[in-house]
Amino acid sequence: MRVDTNFFCTVPMPDAGNPSISPTSRRYDNDAVVECYKNLVDWSKTADALGYDTMWLTEHHFQFEGYEVLPNLILFGMHLAGLTKDLRLGQMFNVVPQWHPLRLAEDFALADIITGGRMEIGVGRGTVPREAWSLGTVVASGDNAMSAEHDRINRETFEEAMEVIKLAWYEERFSYRGKHFVFPADGIPDRGSMVNDLTLIPKPQRVVDIYQPVTSPETIEYVPRAGHKAVYWLQNAESQKQKWDRYAEIREEIGNPVAPGEDRCLVMNMHVGKTREAAMRRGRPGHDEFTKFLAPYGRFSSYRNPDGSKVPFDFNPTVEQSVEQKIQIVGSIDDAVDTLGYWRDLLDLKHLCIFFDFPGLSREEMNEQMHLVAEEVMPRLGEKMDRRPTNAPAALK
């Protein structure tokens, strides 16, 4: 099984889980941000040594609260690639509407060349209005009519940008005329003639896999048709199974079928301990800080009430609800094996990405989590952690 890691890139937060501290009342200085980066360097070396395939990082901006403080995943991933041997570095996710699509295409291509094909690209539409508006786009901010219109514009922008990126990567010359992007712009003079097309410099030296999160019905239909790999996170079992199978159905419909479990990734939040009590004692604060921070964005709306009914958009689950519904893992080695085995059997799972980055864990505790999963959970599950060889020319030295 391919096993990856995912980090939100959170500053050290020893008081995580304190119910009297609201997420927006937190404010951290630049020293705390730099300490997060130092932690990521250390954790990348651990992940590399233990055989994790890819370390995925998360893009966000202007987050004084300290939860997600890495604005450029390609740049930092390229740095980590220079400090590790085999680990791939991925972006989970580049917030595409907040980028100029041609700059994103250039930056990824250059980083992939420099690192010898060890970069993985993930693309998303974004979730945070503070970022989106400040960086020139819009994003939905809740479950209401205004958000629906913002979501429509955001989706259009994203899909056009992805068309531009793929044209630029794989066509020697390209032009594009859409609702939101026109390349080249009309009427550009250049050395005695007019510019009718563009050529991206550089291009990737390989066909690039593109990963995208799948949640909404529209995205479920878009991702397989666009040729992207699907990433699933924080879904109840019924919803997860339906979306997982729908991806394969669409691939079959368009004449590009997939094997069971192929081209789909399950992200699982996990904190394990030698005993269930130890895991709960140390994992509960991080779980509660994580859910408290993300609940206003609707991240846990896939949870269900005991009677099976839907929860509110801004639902904030307890750790017991997360564990009972198998949406997150906080428990013993055996608990983790049981839950991962459930998902493996349900989905024919081949690609697992573990989110270790519950707020409040120290550098040493995070390293311990990666060791426990690689050395105890996966062997007990009967799975070998398979790291893929690169399929690109060697890194530039």
What are these language model-derived features?
Residues 1-87, 207-208, 391-397:
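N-terminal beta1-alpha1-beta2 module of alpha/beta enzyme domains
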Residues 67-91, 157, 371-385:
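Alpha-helix-loop-beta-strand connector modules within alpha/beta enzyme cores
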Residues 22-37, 94-102, 204-215, 270-273, ...:
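Active-site mouth loops of central-metabolism enzymes
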Residues 51, 59, 80, 111, ...:
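Conserved, mostly hydrophobic/aromatic
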Residues 4-28, 142-199, 239-349, 382-397:
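An alpha-helical appendage that flanks or caps ligand/catalytic pockets
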Residues 3-7, 55-57, 88-91, 119-123, ...:
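Hydrophobic faces of well-ordered beta-strands that scaffold small-molecule active sites
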Residues 48-49, 79-85, 108, 112-118, ...:
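Acidic (Asp/Glu)-rich catalytic clusters
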Residues 213-239:
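A conserved active-site cap/scaffold subdomain adjacent to cofactor or substrate pockets
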